[in-house]
């Protein structure tokens, strides 16, 4: 396919009769697909309540030491990186629907292995399986939803991917208060099982069916989702061709590729994992009686502001929310760094984060007051992240790539995201030893500044455009 082929940019699926579709089943199909991200969020949140329980476990139950606990949390990201590659292969060969059905299997199998675990290796194996499923779901669900949605609601439905992730995390936190780790793993089997059931009754995306020359099935899917088959075009010439490196010379390919990979990298370099790492300790410093409340507070803020983002996404647009989100994160990470500078800035202090003890020169009341600065900065950061840099990179990833490279390109984006998440999580402590905690957060603030500049100069607005119009923009048409 070359940029000179006009058929590539013709709309596959336009609004029926020139007006917005009125089909409601598209919301049901999006909900069914979004149960994958809900399962993904539950798997991410599972480690927070499960690790303390597993560290206290008495024989014959498996027990985690500090090293095993670290891997129990981190191995999911490695599995997800592999899942991103697998998902990129599956989504173009098996289709979007079948890929979602298949990813429910390692979700259920992984949680089942954890439930039956008799040793640490079974626990890690179960987490690796759920991580693999997370990687597939994080790629396929946004692609499926973006391809079934009409432009007027694509931002809303696409943002629901991240909304369901944070709902899943919050669900794991709340359930962890009343369920021990085995029963919590049993609960983790419910969302993917429900997804498997519902997706059996949902259609494949019309765009994928068109590229496979399955016209009648595409028309039936369109009627099911949108309530109409009007506004339909033949599949673009070349949309079924496979990816090869020579395509990277085309602006319609390399421009969205650079944007997609950069967005995923900036998301992880924003400092979000560092803020989450410190949440409970900061709440302890602010004299909260139950520091585990921090996880729930963080989860509630994420859900509320991701929901706000979903509601305003198709009005405010992607670029504006990314810029506002980045600016909020710049100020909040800078304030975080100032907190650490004030409490640990003395030359005699360890550079390795023991923030649970205030600096001796600080009175207790002053220490508590500074801790409230950190609590406010943390809540502001989480709200800012949830409004923009949480959901939008995943949404844009599903929008900006042409059909014939979508599987490979989104797979590389997901691989980038999960590898960056693993590296940032595992190496953050080492970074703080070199730069001190305040330096690490100020570095995150600098990355947030770069993310704002990158958005302003490189990221186009996709609000209200068809996927084919977005492709035409990158090709300079």
Swiss-Prot record:
InterPro entries: MFS_dom, MFS_sugar_transport-like, MFS_trans_sf, MFS_Trehalose_Transporter, Sugar/inositol_transpt, Sugar_transporter_CS. One of its GO terms (molecular function) is D-glucose transmembrane transporter activity. A motif (Dileucine internalization motif) lies at residues 12-13. Residues 1-25, 92-96, 149-156, 204-256, 314-319, 389-404, 460-477 are cytoplasmic. Its main location: membrane. Interacts with AP2B1. This is Solute carrier family 2, facilitated glucose transporter member 8. It comes from Homo sapiens (Human). The lineage of its organism: Eukaryota, Metazoa, Chordata, Craniata, Vertebrata.
């Amino acid at each position: 396919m070359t940029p000179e082929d006009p058929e590539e940019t013709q709309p596959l699926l336009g609004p029926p009769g020139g007006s917005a579709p009125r089909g409601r089943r598209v919301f049901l199909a999006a909900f069914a697909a979004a149960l994958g991200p809900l399962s993904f969020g539950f798997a991410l949140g599972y480690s927070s309540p499960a690790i303390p329980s597993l560290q206290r476990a008495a024989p014959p139950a498996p027990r985690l030491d500090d090293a095993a606990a670290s891997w129990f949390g981190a191995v999911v990201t490695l599995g997800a990186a592999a899942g991103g590659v697998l998902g990129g292969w599956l989504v173009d060969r098996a289709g979007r629907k079948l890929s979602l059905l298949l990813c429910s299997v390692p979700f259920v199998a992984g949680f089942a292995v954890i439930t039956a675990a008799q040793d640490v290796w079974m626990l890690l194996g179960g987490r690796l399986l759920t991580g693999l499923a997370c990687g597939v779901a994080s790629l396929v669900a946004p692609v499926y939803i973006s391809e079934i949605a009409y432009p007027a609601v694509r931002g809303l439905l696409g943002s629901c991917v991240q909304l369901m992730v944070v709902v899943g995390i919050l669900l794991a936190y709340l359930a962890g208060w009343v369920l021990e780790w085995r029963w919590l793993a049993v609960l983790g089997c419910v969302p993917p099982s429900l997804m498997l059931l519902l997706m059996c009754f949902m259609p494949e995306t019309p765009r994928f069916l068109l590229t496979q020359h399955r016209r009648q099935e595409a028309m039936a899917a369109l009627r099911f989702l949108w309530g109409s088959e009007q506004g339909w075009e033949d599949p673009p010439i070349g949309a079924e061709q496979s990816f090869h490196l020579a395509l990277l010379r085309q602006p319609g390919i390399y421009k969205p590729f650079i944007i997609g990979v950069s967005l995923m990298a900036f998301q992880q370099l924003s400092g979000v994992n560092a803020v989450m790492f410190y949440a409970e300790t900061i709440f302890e410093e602010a004299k909260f009686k139950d520091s585990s409340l921090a996880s729930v507070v963080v989860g509630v803020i994420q859900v509320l502001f991701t929901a706000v983002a979903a509601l305003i996404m198709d009005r405010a647009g992607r670029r504006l929310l990314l810029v506002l989100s980045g600016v909020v994160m710049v100020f909040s990470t800078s304030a975080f760094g100032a907190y650490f500078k004030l409490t640990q800035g003395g030359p005699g202090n360890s550079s390795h984060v023991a923030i649970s003890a205030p600096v001796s020169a600080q009175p207790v009341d002053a220490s508590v007051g500074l801790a409230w600065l950190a609590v406010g900065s943390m809540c502001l950061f989480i709200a800012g992240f949830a409004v923009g840099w949480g959901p939008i990179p995943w949404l844009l990833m599903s929008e900006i790539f042409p059909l014939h490279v979508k599987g490979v390109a989104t797979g590389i984006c997901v691989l980038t995201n999960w590898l960056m998440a693993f590296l940032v999580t595992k190496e953050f402590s080492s970074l703080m030893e070199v730069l001190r905690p305040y330096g690490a957060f100020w570095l995150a603030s600098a990355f947030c500044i770069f993310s704002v500049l990158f958005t302003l100069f490189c990221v186009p607005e996709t609000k209200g455009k068809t996927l084919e119009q977005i492709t035409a923009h990158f090709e300079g048409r």
